[in-house]
Amino acid sequence: LAYSGLMENKEVTWMPAYGPEQRGGTANVTVIVSDERISSPILSKYDTAIILNQPSLAKFESKIKPGGTLIYDGYGIINPPTRKDIHVYRIDAMDEANERKMAKTFNMIILGGLLKIRPIVSTESILKALRKTLPERHHHLIPMNEEAIRIGMDIIKEE
């Protein structure tokens, strides 16, 4: 997503928190893609959040701006979001990826859902970024990733 934003000449920041959080906490990454200059990569409130598990929902649901967007995967959420002042979308990406025996494309299914409701960058930019960043030996996987993006666009549903 971030690389695709750069390819479209947008302002982009990418700030991961993948350290000790991976081992039992709420690993997260903040990506900002904007047509305007970004003053800080650190946010206290988010326009959009993609949430994949219950601990992350507990931590981040309250940090979405009123009128913002929350996308969640039904597989990892037992108690769905409760806020009424945000747009909530469910995408059953894990179930869909497993059903199609495409488990490694889970993230691309999620990305497809995001791009349907928030077309931050074009799908073509995503595919160009994959061609540019993936080693040549993995280029045969690009059509499967493109299919996963389309699946995500098809299965995301507003609640």
Describe each region flagged by the PLM.
Residues L1-E159:
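Active-site cofactor/cluster-binding pocket
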